[in-house]
Amino acid sequence: MSTSTKWLNEVKWDENGLVPVIAQEASTGDVLMFAWMNREALQRTAETGNAIYWSRSRRKLWHKGEESGHVQKVVELRIDCDNDVVLMKVEQVGGIACHTGRHSCFFQKYLADGRWETVEPVLKDPKDIYS
């Protein structure tokens, strides 16, 4: 990979120096999760080939899968037409992206009667993932 970081200057970072990131499973097109990256996280993600996010609550870099083993191997990075959203196509190791033990964080579906319904099963109990 190139050691140049000029490409990072093309990203439109928000007022907090962050960019929203959508993680999409490369093989299925499933949207797995939404998170944030700062400049260092995006650069290190590109360099290592593993997803590294910025945790807004903990105010530190977060290596996806560092506790669970459910790492995301980056297949492709894209940026939208306004350069302010990153799409990251990934291979989701272990098939679980969500801390709830589900494949995707988007496991609730809106129904016409005004309710949210859980439509994806828990694949592994979070207590077994994070113990």
From Swiss-Prot:
**GO CC annotations on file:** cytoplasm
Which residues participate in Mg(2+) binding?
A: 80, 82, 84
- Keyword match Endoplasmic reticulum: no
Known cofactor(s): Mg(2+); Zn(2+)
Recorded superkingdom: Bacteria
- Per the UniProt entry, the Enzyme Commission number(s) are 3.5.4.19
Could you list this entry's UniProt keywords, alphabetically sorted.
Amino-acid biosynthesis, Cytoplasm, Histidine biosynthesis, Hydrolase, Magnesium, Metal-binding, Zinc
What's noted on cofactor binding? Binds 1 Mg(2+) ion per subunit.
Keyword Nucleus carried by entry: no
Q: Where in the cell is it found?
A: Cytoplasm
Enzyme class, first EC level, given as a word = hydrolase
Q: Which GO terms describe its molecular function?
A: magnesium ion binding; phosphoribosyl-AMP cyclohydrolase activity; zinc ion binding
Which pathway is it part of?
A: Amino-acid biosynthesis; L-histidine biosynthesis; L-histidine from 5-phospho-alpha-D-ribose 1-diphosphate: step 3/9
* Signal peptide start-end: none
Q: Which GO terms describe its biological process?
A: L-histidine biosynthetic process
Reactions catalysed: 1-(5-phospho-beta-D-ribosyl)-5'-AMP + H2O = 1-(5-phospho-beta-D-ribosyl)-5-[(5-phospho-beta-D-ribosylamino)methylideneamino]imidazole-4-carboxamide
> InterPro entries from the entry?
PRA-CH (IPR026660), PRib_AMP_CycHydrolase_dom (IPR002496), PRib_AMP_CycHydrolase_sf (IPR038019)
**Residues holding Zn(2+):** 81, 98, 105
What's this protein's family per the entry?
A: Belongs to the PRA-CH family.
Classification via HAMAP family: HisI (MF_01021)
Q: Per its database record, what is this protein's job?
A: Catalyzes the hydrolysis of the adenine ring of phosphoribosyl-AMP.
Show the NCBIfam families listed in the entry: PRK00051.1
Report quaternary structure and partners: Homodimer.
Q: What is the official name of this protein in its record?
A: Phosphoribosyl-AMP cyclohydrolase
Q: Which organism is it from?
A: Azoarcus sp. (strain BH72)
Gene that this polypeptide is encoded by: hisI
